[in-house]
Amino acid sequence: MKTVKVNIVTPDGPVYDADIEMVSVRAESGDLGILPGHIPTVAPLKIGAVRLKKDGQTELAAVSGGFLEVRPDQVTILAQAAETAESIDKERALAAKKRAEDRLNKRSDDTDIRRAELALQRAVNRLDVAGN
């Protein structure tokens, strides 16, 4: 089966690098499925899971926004933060979720609601990808 090279990169360095059969992402415009030979595309990403189909198995990575660049033979995801499912610290993600929920539940004049909502989305995404 044909494959496409996929790189997931953050400011801290590479997170994922492999040849895969298909990648699925959640872009601002909706969900995208990319196969080898896909037309060149650039799209902003939402907080969500990246699904990577490799050897008939699906691997997951959590991304916190960023951009997707597609070329016929390569897909690059430039993310603000990204983690593979096996590298996610579930305890840390649960703690982040609780902190965000507490901030939203105890709203005060100095609470940045949008920031707390995004923190909650990131934590829930990480927990979903980790399989919790």
From Swiss-Prot:
It is found in: Cell membrane. Its main location: membrane. It comes from the Bacteria. Keywords: ATP synthesis, Cell membrane, CF(1), Hydrogen ion transport, Ion transport, Membrane, Transport. It is a peripheral membrane protein. GO terms for molecular function: ATP binding; proton-transporting ATP synthase activity, rotational mechanism. One of its GO terms (cellular component) is plasma membrane. HAMAP family: ATP_synth_epsil_bac (MF_00530). Produces ATP from ADP in the presence of a proton gradient across the membrane. F-type ATPases have 2 components, CF(1) - the catalytic core - and CF(0) - the membrane proton channel. CF(1) has five subunits: alpha(3), beta(3), gamma(1), delta(1), epsilon(1). CF(0) has three main subunits: a, b and c. Belongs to the ATPase epsilon chain family. This is ATP synthase epsilon chain. It comes from Bacillus velezensis (strain DSM 23117 / BGSC 10A6 / LMG 26770 / FZB42). The gene is atpC.
